[in-house]
């Protein structure tokens, strides 16, 4: 007598950029009668296709992909809004008896979707004062203040990322607690299996360089030029996306196109390291090799992990 198929659960496919998350997500959705829910913060933006490595309709293999192309490039990203949308979609899929396959490398977005994470509110006066100070003094001065108030946040947030520095300082002022104290523990709101795709740094760096080359060949500069006409340069979040920020600088004459291309590779490698560090801190992530030598085994190993009767 065969056992009944497992009841649908949430699967989160996580890890650094260029590790192979998207293809694994499609495979799992095909095998489990699931649908993909995007957890890449920049794939939420309409028209940002080449530079975010968004799967083409053909590459999606007939699998519905949710939360792609939902915001204009002028809209500032909101993890709280993403959380609302992602949970509504996850709840709907589970109610239909389908497996939600959350795919992406934006760590806070993954946590927002599946974990007990509440977002502190905002205070327009505090935000305006901090943004004015950012404009006058620059991000370095505010980052030094953040590092003194919350060393862990100072380490995690780049000294050049004025938007995130302002938000962290705003949360500290509103709550009276360190910014990192407002991040959740490892309390899931869903029965979730988290799969991390692991690729050794030398191989991942090579993949990133090749991916950036393919993006340029596919017309990233033209994509950015078209989005600039739609307000990309004024978009607080979208204009900072890897590749887009560098091409915007080239279009403004601040660097050459070759320099923008090289900086995109460097910045993406740095970003991949931060992504990897973020997910390594979560003991719930089951890591599987996504190395080229193991690619044929990865899908089946992931499927076996998901179909275990007991999750960790």
From Swiss-Prot:
The gene is miaA. It comes from Streptomyces avermitilis (strain ATCC 31267 / DSM 46492 / JCM 5070 / NBRC 14893 / NCIMB 12804 / NRRL 8165 / MA-4680). GO terms for molecular function: ATP binding; tRNA dimethylallyltransferase activity. Belongs to the IPP transferase family. It comes from the Bacteria. It holds the Pfam family IPPT. SUPFAM superfamilies: P-loop containing nucleoside triphosphate hydrolases. This is tRNA dimethylallyltransferase. Keywords: ATP-binding, Magnesium, Nucleotide-binding, Transferase, tRNA processing. ATP binds at residues 15-22. The record marks 106, 127 as: Interaction with substrate tRNA. Catalyzes the transfer of a dimethylallyl group onto the adenine at position 37 in tRNAs that read codons beginning with uridine, leading to the formation of N6-(dimethylallyl)adenosine (i(6)A). Its cofactor is Mg(2+). GO terms for biological process: tRNA modification. The keyword Magnesium applies. Monomer. Its EC number is 2.5.1.75. It is an enzyme of class 2 (transferase). InterPro entries: Dimethylallyltransferase (IPR039657), IPT (IPR018022), P-loop_NTPase (IPR027417). HAMAP family: IPP_trans. Substrate binds at residues 17-22.
């Amino acid at each position: 007598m065969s056992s009944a198929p497992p009841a649908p659960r949430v699967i989160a496919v996580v890890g650094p950029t260029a590790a192979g998350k998207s293809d694994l997500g499609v495979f799992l959705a095909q095998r489990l009668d699931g649908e993909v829910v995007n957890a890449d913060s920049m794939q939420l933006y309409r028209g940002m296709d080449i530079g975010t490595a968004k799967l083409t309709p053909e590459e999606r293999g007939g699998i519905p992909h949710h939360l792609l192309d939902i915001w204009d490039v002028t809209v500032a990203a909101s993890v709280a809004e993403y959380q609302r949308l992602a949970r509504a979609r996850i709840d709907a899929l589970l109610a239909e008896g389908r497996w939600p396959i959350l795919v992406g490398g934006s760590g806070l977005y993954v946590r927002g979707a599946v974990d007990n994470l509440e977002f502190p509110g905002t205070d327009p006066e505090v935000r305006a004062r901090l943004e004015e100070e950012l404009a006058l003094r620059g991000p370095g001065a505010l980052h030094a203040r953040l590092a003194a108030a919350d060393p862990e946040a100072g380490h995690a947030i780049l000294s050049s990322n004025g938007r995130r520095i302002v938000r962290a300082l705003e949360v500290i002022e509103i709550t009276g607690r360190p910014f990192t104290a407002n991040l959740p523990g490892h309390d899931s709101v869903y029965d979730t299996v988290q799969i991390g795709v692991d690729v050794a740094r030398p191989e991942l760096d090579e993949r990133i360089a090749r991916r950036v080359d393919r993006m340029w060949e596919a017309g990233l500069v033209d994509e950015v030029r078209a989005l600039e006409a739609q307000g990309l340069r004024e978009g607080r979040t979208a204009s900072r996306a890897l590749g887009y920020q560098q091409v915007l600088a080239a279009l403004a004459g601040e660097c050459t196109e070759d320099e923008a291309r090289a900086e995109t590779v460097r910045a993406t490698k740095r970003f991949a390291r931060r992504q990897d560090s973020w997910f390594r801190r979560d003991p719930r992530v089951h890591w599987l090799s996504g190395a080229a030598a193991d690619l044929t085994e990865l899908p089946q190993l992931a499927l076996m992990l998901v179909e275990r009767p007991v999750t960790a």
